[in-house]
Every structure is written in structure tokens, then in C-alpha cells.
């Protein structure tokens, strides 16, 4: 009986081994890239494949935006099929750290905190920090962070905008962080807050949709938000220690210029869905 049980277990292990090998070989031809699919102009969800959108794994929807453009370039250079995985913001780093996905391309700042658990590529976009308010707001003519004093404000959860920038506003009434960038913009549009802090691409996308929003950019002045270079450099996160994949991504980025990044972002903003 014991020999039969051992033989059965060995057979099961061999069977599982062959199955795993087959799955591994199949997965080698697929590049799994995670993003929110709700963060225009970086990434968003749409119902068709227009403009080159890519199917979102496990759904009938498609993803597009700057991050998808970049993911397509990387997958093509590696000769792999691109698979987009839709995750909420807080699940992105754990997913790539555990190896559930190959990389995250989602407008992530290259922060020291994130670098403790994942590796980052060279920057794939440089995103300055700006403020959005309404045209009829008391803050519409602000020329410095100090001019935003006393404002009721919010931003997106888990971002440097909320964690680092909002506390720099004197006597700010900081409300609960919003789960997504669209929710942050709705808070401003509805009048729930006086202003939100975000990055330039998100703000440009917002003003293209909401005609009553005003973009305030204090960058390069004495009254700008105090942030480090790492906090405004956006990178592609990869599982720690995967040097081969990191090198492959950086090789693609090395072929692109800042002007290329800006042109791609402009294209993304031009075709973003109004709902985003």
C-alpha cells in the first residue's frame, strides 16, 4: 500500500511538473503589465480597440493611454504578446513585488519607499507638480503655494500629491484622499473642495474635459511645491532582482527622448475619453 501511495504521489508530481512547464513556456511569450486603467491620460478603460487599445485581461474592455503606448513599445521590442492587467492603485506594487505581473506602468513616482520592495527603470516621464482649481475660485490667481492658504483640498490616495504636497499649503483643510484620479477631479468639479494637487499630464487632461478648471503651475519659482527629483520622475516598476527585464526596459527607454515622451503624452491627451 505504501509503495502504491508513493507511486501515485510521484505520478501526480510529474504531471503537475509537466503542466507547470507548459504554462511557464506559454507565459514566457506574454508580458503582463499592470495599471489602474482609470488614470487618464496615463491609462484608461474603453469599450473598443480604437486608437490601438489593448484588451484588459479577464474583461470585455480595452485599455489605452500613455502607459499602454509605452507597454506596447516594450512588448514589441521583446517579441512578446502584451497582456494588460487592471488593478487598483494599492495593489500595483504588491502584484509586481510578488511576481504576479511582470511590471507596472502606471504613472508611479520613483520613491525611496517603493524602491525598498521593487526595482525601477529609468524615468519614462518627468511630471511636474501643479494645482487645479475652478475659474471662479478665490484661488484662481494664486502665484505660489502660500497663496493657497486655508484652502479645502484633496488629491489621490497613495500619491506624493496627497502625502507630501498638500501638507505644504498653510492652514489647509485636507479632506480624505480620493481612490482614483477621476474621483479627485469630480471632488473639485462638484465644489466639494477648492483645489486639488496633481501632476501636469493629469491637469492638462482635466482642463481638456472641464472647461471651468484652471491650472496653476508654480514650478521654477520661489513659491513652488518642494519635492525631490525622485518624486517627479516616473518609472516602470519591476520585481526586485530581475536585472534582465530591467535592462530590456531601459534599452527601450534609451531610444526615446524627452520630446518623444511629450509627443506621446500629447497624443494620449488628444484621444482620452471624456468620461475619464
Regions found by a protein language model. Name each.
Residues 37-40, 60-76, 108, 128-185, ...:
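Bilobed "Venus flytrap"/periplasmic-binding protein-like clamshell domains
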Residues 160-179, 215-216, 247-276:
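Ligand-binding clefts/hinges and TM-proximal coupling segments of bilobed small-molecule sensing domains
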Amino acid at each position: 500500500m505504501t509503495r502504491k501511495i508513493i507511486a501515485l504521489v510521484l505520478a501526480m508530481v510529474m504531471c503537475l511538473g509537466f503542466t507547470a512547464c507548459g504554462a511557464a513556456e506559454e507565459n514566457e511569450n506574454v508580458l503582463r503589465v499592470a495599471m489602474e486603467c482609470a488614470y487618464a491620460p496615463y491609462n484608461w478603460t474603453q469599450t473598443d480597440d480604437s486608437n490601438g487599445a489593448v484588451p484588459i485581461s479577464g474583461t470585455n474592455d480595452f485599455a489605452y493611454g500613455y502607459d499602454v503606448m509605452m507597454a506596447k513599445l516594450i512588448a514589441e521590442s521583446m517579441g512578446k504578446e502584451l497582456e494588460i492587467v487592471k488593478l487598483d492603485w494599492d495593489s500595483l506594487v504588491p502584484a509586481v513585488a510578488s511576481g504576479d505581473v511582470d511590471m507596472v506602468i502606471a504613472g508611479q513616482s520613483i520613491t525611496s519607499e517603493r524602491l525598498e520592495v521593487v526595482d525601477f527603470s529609468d524615468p519614462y516621464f518627468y511630471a511636474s507638480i501643479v494645482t487645479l482649481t475652478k475659474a471662479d475660485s478665490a484661488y484662481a490667481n494664486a502665484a505660489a503655494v502660500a497663496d493657497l492658504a486655508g484652502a479645502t483640498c484633496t488629491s489621490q490616495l497613495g500619491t506624493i500629491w496627497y502625502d507630501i504636497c498638500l501638507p505644504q499649503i498653510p492652514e489647509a483643510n485636507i479632506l480624505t484622499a480620493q481612490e482614483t484620479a477621476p474621483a479627485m477631479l469630480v471632488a473639485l468639479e462638484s465644489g466639494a473642495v477648492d483645489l486639488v494637487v496633481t501632476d501636469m499630464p493629469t491637469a492638462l487632461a482635466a482642463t481638456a474635459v472641464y472647461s471651468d478648471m484652471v491650472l496653476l503651475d508654480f514650478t521654477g519659482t520661489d513659491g513652488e511645491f518642494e519635492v525631490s527629483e525622485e518624486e517627479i520622475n516616473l518609472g516602470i516598476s519591476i520585481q526586485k532582482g530581475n536585472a534582465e527585464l530591467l535592462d530590456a526596459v531601459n534599452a527601450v527607454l534609451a531610444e526615446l527622448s524627452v520630446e518623444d515622451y511629450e509627443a506621446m503624452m500629447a497624443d494620449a491627451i488628444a484621444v482620452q475619453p471624456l468620461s475619464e
